[in-house]
Swiss-Prot record:
Subunit relationships: The 20S proteasome core is composed of 14 alpha and 14 beta subunits that assemble into four stacked heptameric rings, resulting in a barrel-shaped structure. The two inner rings, each composed of seven catalytic beta subunits, are sandwiched by two outer rings, each composed of seven alpha subunits. The catalytic chamber with the active sites is on the inside of the barrel. Has a gated structure, the ends of the cylinder being occluded by the N-termini of the alpha-subunits. Is capped at one or both ends by the proteasome regulatory ATPase, PAN.
Name the record gives this protein: Proteasome subunit alpha
Species whose genome carries this gene: Methanopyrus kandleri (strain AV19 / DSM 6324 / JCM 9639 / NBRC 100938)
Domain of life: Archaea
Recorded family membership: Belongs to the peptidase T1A family.
Description of how activity is regulated: The formation of the proteasomal ATPase PAN-20S proteasome complex, via the docking of the C-termini of PAN into the intersubunit pockets in the alpha-rings, triggers opening of the gate for substrate entry. Interconversion between the open-gate and close-gate conformations leads to a dynamic regulation of the 20S proteasome proteolysis activity.
Record Pfam families: Proteasome (PF00227), Proteasome_A_N (PF10584)
Subcellular location: Cytoplasm
A GO term for molecular function: threonine-type endopeptidase activity
Biological processes, Gene Ontology terms: proteasomal protein catabolic process; ubiquitin-dependent protein catabolic process
Function: Component of the proteasome core, a large protease complex with broad specificity involved in protein degradation.
Length: 246
């Protein structure tokens, strides 16, 4: 996003609105999210799928050392896009919120309560001098007394609940896949396959199974898919598309 001369004065202070009602530092934080690798979530009746394209840029990097899907509590997980260090801070805060709630009330925290707490923190970082907005967005998924839940959080502190959504640089490509193929009556297995397909399309057909990180949250709790299962799923989904294209 190009900086116009008239707006430079409003870049200096995070708490100053421009004449047209914009907070430029929040907009720049959103740009950081757009530059991040694609993360997505899909909600079905059986549970919620979270997936991320980790984009390992060098063969010298151990793929398992890069983590962008996190467990928050036994029934909640999160996927991130944007600045990884900022995401870690928010994930740790979310874990503390969940643990504190469980210790205080003797029961697991509802997903929307946790999401609102994290978004409240994000919003505070848009109001005070000496800090900057978090340059990351989170997809927070879980299962609570209200059923399966999937939320998207914005650097401004805004939150929205979704059936399926994506963040990061491949957001639009993934949403195009969801618009065409998502169904509310999908099985969890079908949702996982859709996540793999959407991540592949979002990468402009350049990603590999090694770059994918996928987790599921259902009534049994949070769990990440094993590498072997992701490779088998990737081969089945991507292989079938290549066969159709021949």
């Amino acid at each position: 996003m190009a900086v116009q001369p008239a707006q430079t004065a409003y870049d200096r202070a995070i708490t100053v609105f421009s004449p047209d009602g914009r907070l430029f530092q929040v907009e720049y934080a959103r740009e950081a999210v757009k530059r991040g690798t694609t993360a997505l979530g899909i909600k079905v009746e059986e549970g919620v799928v979270l997936g991320v394209d980790k984009r390992v840029t060098s063969k010298l990097i151990e793929p398992e050392s890069i983590e962008k899907v996190y467990q928050i509590d036994t029934h909640i997980g999160a996927a991130t896009a944007g600045l990884v260090a900022d995401a870690r801070v928010l994930v740790e805060r979310a874990r503390i919120e969940a643990q504190t709630y469980r210790y205080t009330y003797g029961e697991p925290i509802d997903v929307d309560v946790l999401v609102k707490a994290i978004c409240d923190l994000k919003q505070v970082y848009t109001q005070h001098g000496g800090v900057r907005p978090f340059g990351t967005a989170l997809l927070i998924a879980g299962v609570d007394t209200k059923g399966c839940r999937l939320f998207e959080t914005d650097p401004s502190g805004a939150l929205t609940e979704h059936k399926a959504t994506a963040i990061g640089e491949g957001r639009q490509e993934a949403l195009d896949v969801f618009e065409e193929e998502y169904r509310e009556d999908m099985t969890l297995q079908e949702a996982i396959e859709l996540a793999v397909r959407a991540l592949y399309e979002a990468s402009r057909e350049e990603t590999t199974a090694d770059n994918l990180e996928i987790a599921v949250v259902d009534k049994q709790g949070f769990r990440k898919l094993e590498r072997k299962k992701i490779e088998e799923m990737f081969e089945r989904v991507v292989g079938s598309e290549e066969d159709e294209g021949e």
